[in-house]
Amino acid sequence: MSAIRPEEISSLIKERIANFKSEIEVVDVGTVIQVGDGIARVHGLEKAMQGELLEFQNGVMGMVLNLEEDNVGVVIMGPFRDIKEGDTVKRTGRVMEVPVGEALLGRVVNPLGQPIDGQGPIANNGFRPIESPAPGVMARKSVHEPLQTGIKAIDAMIPVGRGQRELIIGDRQTGKTAVALDTIINQKGKDMICIYVAIGQKQSTVANIVETLRKAGALEYTIIVSATASDPAPMLYLAPYTGVTMAEYFMYKGGHVLCVYDDLSKQAAAYREMSLLLRRPPGREAYPGDVFYLHSRLLERAAKLSDDLGAGSITALPFIETQAGDISAYIPTNVISITDGQIFLETDLFNAGQRPAVNTGLSVSRVGGSAQIKAMKKVAGPLKLELAQYRELAAFAQFGSDLDKATQARLTRGERLMEIMKQGQFDPMPVEKQVASIYSATRGFLDDIPVAEVRRFEKEMLSFLDSNKPQLLEHIRTTKDLPDEKEFNAAIEEFKKGFSVTR
């Protein structure tokens, strides 16, 4: 064995000393002084900012919501059972961010952007903070492009445009989710990205929705953000912001996005739970004072951007669940005042077989005709008027049997219009067929058809036009206007002659 020379050792030690770099990582560290119910109070983080992410000793993340004199109130984003008093908490200096990008399409993620569908990790195009300012006045453009839902009652009377916020409100089990799923399925081939945010739903329900969209071929352009009923309140609170953040990535690239929040009542309840645990003063219905801002800052991020910014859009369909049809409660009135209209679904109509159960009297779109094609505007005008007159007369007709001919004719027409507004679930209809269907009803072609036969008449008439007079439907599709009325009437008359009423 060769002997080690002392000069070699000394030169080696000198080299090591010269190359030594002392790296000191300075972090703000605080101590947990109280923990429970998903909330922790942390002492010693005076420099923490509102909305900042903190890291607990066991790796679980938390978000600062309360800044108090001697401690900060933190909501915990994960299991809080292992966190105990005396644990250390580090500041990260970062706010909450989620991954964005095309790779998220077709995937199911939680509000932190982590995949929960068992299909492996997701490559992303970077991260965006979940709280970002809404586009300003000059960055916006008025809503003028229709977003076809494929549902006759909505596209004709309560039209939705790209960049609009349209509230869907109703009791539980009135078909709110069905309306949203039909709308998502109808966006196939229309260059739209869809984001479905499930807030406080059962896991089985979310699994059914994923399967429904997959079967319809709609999952490939849809992202599902799911905060289920078993998730902690902060996850339910974050889910809608995660959804709109992912949507903004596409909007600012000039894309068009449909964002469905199902439903915001559960988000408000989760926020109320967090606020009460953080000892914030309660207001009406025990909601905190800033519950209006909770929803307004979310829904204001839906916009139609100006041409200078790429003319992209986010259309928001927020859901609110009412109790026994009470739309004058706190959260419903808040969201009605924030949105550009509401679609009111009614239990009585649903139980009477009128599905989708849209109450056309209480529903409204504040964008209106500017979100409709010319042909639909022409046929929808008489439809709204006739249905309003029918509703008025139907109330009186219950009391008296002696009705004059004009009143009887109105009631007859109204019954058939109500029947033609019915539609099967997951069966969205292209706009040209909607126009043909409503045209036949408002022009009196159905007046002598029994109500029970109206749906069959409609189905067979549309397939007749498809196979024998495709140029009429093609004209509506391409020019967005009605074809020559004489030709249209003659085609419907020709079909009607061959239509046999079953006795």
Swiss-Prot record:
One of its GO terms (molecular function) is ATP binding. The record marks 363 as: Required for activity. Produces ATP from ADP in the presence of a proton gradient across the membrane. The alpha chain is a regulatory subunit. Keywords: ATP synthesis, ATP-binding, Cell membrane, CF(1), Hydrogen ion transport, Ion transport, Membrane, Nucleotide-binding, Translocase, Transport. F-type ATPases have 2 components, CF(1) - the catalytic core - and CF(0) - the membrane proton channel. CF(1) has five subunits: alpha(3), beta(3), gamma(1), delta(1), epsilon(1). CF(0) has three main subunits: a(1), b(2) and c(9-12). The alpha and beta chains form an alternating ring which encloses part of the gamma chain. CF(1) is attached to CF(0) by a central stalk formed by the gamma and epsilon chains, while a peripheral stalk is formed by the delta and b chains. It catalyses: ATP + H2O + 4 H(+)(in) = ADP + phosphate + 5 H(+)(out). GO terms for cellular component: plasma membrane; proton-transporting ATP synthase complex. Signal peptide: none annotated. Its EC number is 7.1.2.2. NCBIfam families: atpA, PRK13343.1. The lineage of its organism: Bacteria, Bacillati, Bacillota, Bacilli, Bacillales. It is a peripheral membrane protein. Pfam families: ATP-synt_ab (PF00006), ATP-synt_ab_C (PF00306), ATP-synt_ab_N (PF02874). ATP binds at residues 170-177. It comes from the Bacteria. It is found in: Cell membrane. Belongs to the ATPase alpha/beta chains family. This is ATP synthase subunit alpha.
